[in-house]
From Swiss-Prot:
Pfam families: Vesi_VP2. It comes from Feline calicivirus (strain Japanese F4) (FCV). This is Minor capsid protein VP2. The keyword Ribosomal protein does not apply. It is found in: Virion; Host cytoplasm. InterPro entries: Vesivirus_VP2. Minor structural protein that forms a portal-like structure at a unique three-fold axis of symmetry, following binding to the host receptor. The virion attaches to feline junctional adhesion molecule A (F11R). Once attached, the virion is endocytosed. Acidification of the endosome induces conformational change of capsid protein thereby injecting virus genomic RNA into host cytoplasm. The channel formed by VP2 may allow the delivery of the viral genome through the host endosomal membrane. Belongs to the vesivirus VP2 protein family. Keywords: Capsid decoration protein, Capsid protein, Host cytoplasm, Virion.
Amino acid sequence: MNSILGLIDTVTNTVGKGQQIELDKAALGQQRELALQRMSLDRQALNNQVEQFNKLLEQRVHGPIQSVRLARAAGFRVDPYSYTNQNFYDDQLNAIRLSYRNLFKN
């Protein structure tokens, strides 16, 4: 009788553990989905930051260039490189883009 009860107890424990494993797998699957969604949102946020940075950078670069053009149109002699260094801004932008790209390499 004890051996039958022991066997029933063992089977019950095994079934319970199997169910717990299945529940754990389902929970891990949900956590994985949530993590993937969070990564997607983080990637979108970083892309938005890069986009905003690009707009700011464009304003900082093209603003002085526009000023130089207006000054030239008004008859002044202007050295555009004393106002802005396009290569410096391009290099900075490329470095930032590269660092963001490296962040998401798989």
